[in-house]
């Protein structure tokens, strides 16, 4: 394979990842199959970078003319519109299942139900409120820091969530599941590029902030793995969405705490 063909393949994979995790349409010339979708997992972090960057741009463009809370809300709306609430939906389904089921089978069945339950509604409300409040505090501290935090959090949270595909068991047998093509374990190339995208984006932070966030994300990933294994024995597409949302919130929390003590 020539260098040009290799670059074309990588661009194809990024566009597949973008089309899967956002509402941004893929070019018509991009062909999608299960193998491509699995390999595209290497670029999930870069998709987060794109979503975070666009959300940050909306915030930066509006924060001089609008109250911080409104600018933050507009940035959050931008993120939801770009992704179609993909991860938020997974968060709600996960909390409905984990909160309402006794056995792993019950939890998986409840998570499959498209209706929103009380546990999912509470989780969505609390996460969105907490995300808004943390970002408002960051915006009042420094608008540049707040926008940078959006970029970092959207990227790193997706890296952590997608890394679960590499180590954990996919527990749905339903062939119609949208996440089924992702369920094959990632190769070393996929994992390396995925982690590299997360590490590189940390370079926008100060040394202590980057190190603190890295250590917290490593610990949080381990905690998420333990919980998912105990609850359902592995992961589903919904739990990956929940992991992304939780990691994003924790990113903002860490950056706010570190920023306040520097």
UniProtKB/Swiss-Prot annotation:
EC number(s) given by UniProt: 2.7.8.26
Pathway annotation from the record: Cofactor biosynthesis; adenosylcobalamin biosynthesis; adenosylcobalamin from cob(II)yrinate a,c-diamide: step 7/7
InterPro entries xrefs: CobS
Function comment: Joins adenosylcobinamide-GDP and alpha-ribazole to generate adenosylcobalamin (Ado-cobalamin). Also synthesizes adenosylcobalamin 5'-phosphate from adenosylcobinamide-GDP and alpha-ribazole 5'-phosphate.
Name this polypeptide is given: Adenosylcobinamide-GDP ribazoletransferase
Signal peptide: none
UniProt record similarity statement: Belongs to the CobS family.
């Amino acid at each position: 394979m020539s260098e040009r063909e290799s670059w074309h393949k990588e661009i194809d994979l990024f566009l597949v990842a973008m089309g899967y995790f956002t509402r941004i349409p893929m070019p018509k010339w991009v062909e999608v199959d299960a193998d491509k979708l699995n390999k595209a997992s290497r670029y999930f972090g870069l998709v987060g970078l794109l979503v975070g960057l666009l959300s940050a741009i909306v915030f930066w463009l509006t924060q001089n003319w609008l109250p911080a809370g409104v600018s933050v809300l507009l940035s959050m709306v931008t993120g939801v519109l770009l992704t179609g609430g993909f991860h938020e939906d997974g968060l709600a389904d996960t909390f409905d299942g984990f909160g309402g089921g006794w056995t792993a089978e019950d939890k998986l069945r409840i998570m499959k139900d498209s209706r929103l339950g009380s546990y999912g509604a509470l989780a969505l409300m609390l996460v969105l409120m907490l995300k808004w409040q943390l970002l408002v505090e960051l915006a009042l501290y420094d608008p540049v820091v707040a926008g940078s935090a959006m970029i970092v959090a959207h990227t790193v949270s997706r890296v952590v969530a997608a890394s679960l595909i590499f180590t954990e068991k996919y527990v749905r047998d339903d062939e119609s599941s949208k996440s089924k093509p992702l369920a094959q374990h990632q190769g070393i190339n996929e994992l390396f590029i995925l982690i590299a995208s997360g590490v590189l984006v940390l370079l926008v932070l100060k040394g202590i902030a980057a190190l603190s966030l890295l250590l917290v994300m490593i610990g949080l990933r381990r905690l998420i793995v333990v919980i998912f294994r105990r609850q359902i024995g592995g992961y589903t597409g919904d739990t990956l969405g929940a992991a992304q949302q939780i990691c994003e919130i924790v990113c903002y929390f860490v950056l706010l705490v570190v920023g306040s003590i520097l």
